[in-house]
Amino acid sequence: MNKILKLTFVLFLICAIVAGVLGGVNELTKDRIYAIQNAATIAAYSAVLDAEGYDEVDFDRTAFPVVDKISEATNGAGHVVELTVSGAQGLITLAVGVDTDAKCSGISIIEHSETSGLGANAAADSEIGRNFRAQFVGEGEDIALSKSGGHIDALAGATITSNAVTGAVATAIQAVNSLG
Protein backbone atom coordinates (compact mmCIF):
# COMPACT_ATOMS: atom_id res chain seq x y z
CA MET A 1 0.00 0.00 0.00
CA ASN A 2 2.85 2.36 0.89
CA LYS A 3 4.48 1.68 -2.49
CA ILE A 4 1.25 2.60 -4.33
CA LEU A 5 1.05 5.91 -2.46
CA LYS A 6 4.67 6.73 -3.36
CA LEU A 7 4.07 5.95 -7.04
CA THR A 8 0.85 7.98 -7.01
CA PHE A 9 2.64 10.94 -5.43
CA VAL A 10 5.52 10.75 -7.93
CA LEU A 11 3.08 10.56 -10.84
CA PHE A 12 1.12 13.52 -9.43
CA LEU A 13 4.34 15.51 -9.04
CA ILE A 14 5.42 14.78 -12.62
CA CYS A 15 1.99 15.78 -13.94
CA ALA A 16 2.01 19.00 -11.90
CA ILE A 17 5.47 19.96 -13.19
CA VAL A 18 4.54 19.22 -16.81
CA ALA A 19 1.28 21.17 -16.45
CA GLY A 20 3.20 24.10 -14.98
CA VAL A 21 5.72 24.07 -17.83
CA LEU A 22 2.95 23.90 -20.45
CA GLY A 23 1.09 26.75 -18.74
CA GLY A 24 4.26 28.83 -18.67
CA VAL A 25 5.02 28.19 -22.34
CA ASN A 26 1.43 29.11 -23.22
CA GLU A 27 1.70 32.35 -21.24
CA LEU A 28 4.99 33.23 -22.96
CA THR A 29 3.73 32.54 -26.49
CA LYS A 30 0.06 33.60 -26.44
CA ASP A 31 0.71 37.20 -27.50
CA ARG A 32 2.92 36.11 -30.39
CA ILE A 33 0.38 33.50 -31.53
CA TYR A 34 -2.40 36.11 -31.41
CA ALA A 35 -0.29 38.56 -33.43
CA ILE A 36 0.42 35.94 -36.10
CA GLN A 37 -3.26 34.95 -36.33
CA ASN A 38 -4.31 38.60 -36.49
CA ALA A 39 -1.76 39.32 -39.24
CA ALA A 40 -3.07 36.35 -41.25
CA THR A 41 -6.63 37.62 -40.90
CA ILE A 42 -5.67 41.15 -41.96
CA ALA A 43 -3.80 39.73 -44.96
CA ALA A 44 -6.87 37.66 -45.89
CA TYR A 45 -9.10 40.74 -45.63
CA SER A 46 -6.74 42.81 -47.77
CA ALA A 47 -6.61 40.05 -50.39
CA VAL A 48 -10.40 40.06 -50.86
CA LEU A 49 -11.19 43.79 -50.57
CA ASP A 50 -8.66 46.58 -50.93
CA ALA A 51 -8.96 48.94 -47.97
CA GLU A 52 -6.72 50.60 -45.41
CA GLY A 53 -8.87 49.46 -42.52
CA TYR A 54 -12.02 47.65 -41.52
CA ASP A 55 -14.65 48.41 -38.88
CA GLU A 56 -16.72 45.55 -37.47
CA VAL A 57 -20.48 45.99 -37.89
CA ASP A 58 -23.45 44.41 -36.13
CA PHE A 59 -25.59 41.85 -37.94
CA ASP A 60 -28.34 39.32 -37.21
CA ARG A 61 -26.35 36.37 -35.86
CA THR A 62 -29.43 34.16 -35.61
CA ALA A 63 -30.19 34.61 -39.32
CA PHE A 64 -26.57 33.91 -40.29
CA PRO A 65 -25.12 31.42 -37.78
CA VAL A 66 -22.07 30.54 -39.91
CA VAL A 67 -21.00 34.19 -40.12
CA ASP A 68 -18.35 35.00 -37.52
CA LYS A 69 -17.86 38.67 -38.31
CA ILE A 70 -18.75 41.36 -40.84
CA SER A 71 -16.38 44.28 -41.28
CA GLU A 72 -16.96 47.37 -43.39
CA ALA A 73 -14.06 48.82 -45.35
CA THR A 74 -13.17 52.27 -44.03
CA ASN A 75 -12.81 53.55 -47.62
CA GLY A 76 -16.38 52.52 -48.53
CA ALA A 77 -15.27 49.77 -50.93
CA GLY A 78 -17.61 47.20 -49.39
CA HIS A 79 -17.54 44.59 -46.65
CA VAL A 80 -15.50 41.57 -45.65
CA VAL A 81 -17.42 38.66 -44.17
CA GLU A 82 -15.61 36.04 -42.11
CA LEU A 83 -17.41 32.69 -42.02
CA THR A 84 -16.83 29.19 -40.73
CA VAL A 85 -18.55 26.41 -42.67
CA SER A 86 -18.39 22.61 -42.67
CA GLY A 87 -16.21 21.08 -45.36
CA ALA A 88 -15.51 17.45 -46.19
CA GLN A 89 -12.97 16.88 -43.40
CA GLY A 90 -13.79 19.62 -40.92
CA LEU A 91 -14.35 23.33 -40.64
CA ILE A 92 -13.31 25.89 -43.25
CA THR A 93 -12.82 29.50 -42.16
CA LEU A 94 -12.78 32.00 -44.98
CA ALA A 95 -13.01 35.69 -45.71
CA VAL A 96 -15.30 36.84 -48.50
CA GLY A 97 -15.11 40.33 -49.95
CA VAL A 98 -18.43 41.84 -51.01
CA ASP A 99 -18.26 45.04 -53.06
CA THR A 100 -20.79 47.88 -53.11
CA ASP A 101 -22.70 46.16 -55.96
CA ALA A 102 -23.28 43.09 -53.74
CA LYS A 103 -20.86 41.02 -55.81
CA CYS A 104 -18.00 38.88 -54.56
CA SER A 105 -14.71 40.75 -54.84
CA GLY A 106 -12.61 37.77 -53.75
CA ILE A 107 -12.26 34.92 -51.29
CA SER A 108 -9.43 33.89 -49.03
CA ILE A 109 -9.38 30.67 -47.06
CA ILE A 110 -7.94 31.44 -43.65
CA GLU A 111 -7.98 27.97 -42.11
CA HIS A 112 -9.10 24.49 -43.12
CA SER A 113 -8.54 20.79 -42.54
CA GLU A 114 -9.46 19.50 -45.99
CA THR A 115 -7.77 16.55 -47.68
CA SER A 116 -4.39 17.38 -49.20
CA GLY A 117 -4.51 17.29 -52.99
CA LEU A 118 -8.32 17.44 -53.06
CA GLY A 119 -10.29 19.93 -50.95
CA ALA A 120 -7.09 21.60 -49.79
CA ASN A 121 -6.61 22.79 -53.37
CA ALA A 122 -9.27 25.43 -52.67
CA ALA A 123 -6.78 27.22 -50.43
CA ALA A 124 -3.58 26.25 -52.23
CA ASP A 125 -1.28 28.87 -53.68
CA SER A 126 -1.19 26.96 -56.95
CA GLU A 127 -2.77 27.47 -60.35
CA ILE A 128 -5.62 25.15 -59.38
CA GLY A 129 -6.31 27.04 -56.15
CA ARG A 130 -6.01 30.50 -57.69
CA ASN A 131 -8.27 29.53 -60.62
CA PHE A 132 -10.86 28.04 -58.27
CA ARG A 133 -10.98 31.16 -56.08
CA ALA A 134 -10.96 33.53 -59.09
CA GLN A 135 -14.25 32.04 -60.36
CA PHE A 136 -16.11 33.67 -57.49
CA VAL A 137 -15.12 37.25 -58.35
CA GLY A 138 -18.10 39.15 -59.76
CA GLU A 139 -20.66 36.55 -58.70
CA GLY A 140 -23.82 37.51 -56.78
CA GLU A 141 -25.87 35.74 -54.14
CA ASP A 142 -27.38 33.39 -56.76
CA ILE A 143 -23.96 31.75 -57.13
CA ALA A 144 -23.98 27.99 -57.77
CA LEU A 145 -21.78 25.17 -58.99
CA SER A 146 -22.00 24.43 -62.72
CA LYS A 147 -23.62 21.05 -62.04
CA SER A 148 -26.45 23.01 -60.38
CA GLY A 149 -26.79 25.48 -63.25
CA GLY A 150 -24.25 28.04 -62.04
CA HIS A 151 -20.86 29.23 -63.27
CA ILE A 152 -18.55 27.74 -60.63
CA ASP A 153 -16.57 24.64 -61.61
CA ALA A 154 -16.05 22.30 -58.66
CA LEU A 155 -12.59 21.11 -57.74
CA ALA A 156 -11.99 17.59 -59.08
CA GLY A 157 -12.68 15.09 -56.30
CA ALA A 158 -13.71 17.83 -53.88
CA THR A 159 -17.38 18.47 -54.48
CA ILE A 160 -18.18 18.84 -50.78
CA THR A 161 -15.49 21.48 -50.32
CA SER A 162 -16.60 23.25 -53.50
CA ASN A 163 -20.22 23.25 -52.29
CA ALA A 164 -19.14 24.56 -48.88
CA VAL A 165 -17.14 27.45 -50.33
CA THR A 166 -19.88 28.31 -52.84
CA GLY A 167 -22.50 28.28 -50.10
CA ALA A 168 -20.28 30.45 -47.91
CA VAL A 169 -19.94 33.06 -50.65
CA ALA A 170 -23.73 33.13 -51.17
CA THR A 171 -24.27 33.46 -47.41
CA ALA A 172 -21.71 36.26 -47.16
CA ILE A 173 -23.48 38.27 -49.85
CA GLN A 174 -26.89 37.62 -48.26
CA ALA A 175 -25.54 38.74 -44.87
CA VAL A 176 -24.20 41.99 -46.34
CA ASN A 177 -27.49 42.58 -48.18
CA SER A 178 -29.35 42.17 -44.88
CA LEU A 179 -27.45 45.10 -43.39
CA GLY A 180 -29.70 47.50 -45.27
Regions found by a protein language model. Give the residues of each.
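Flexible, solvent-exposed loop/hinge segments and secondary-structure transition points
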Residues: N2-G180
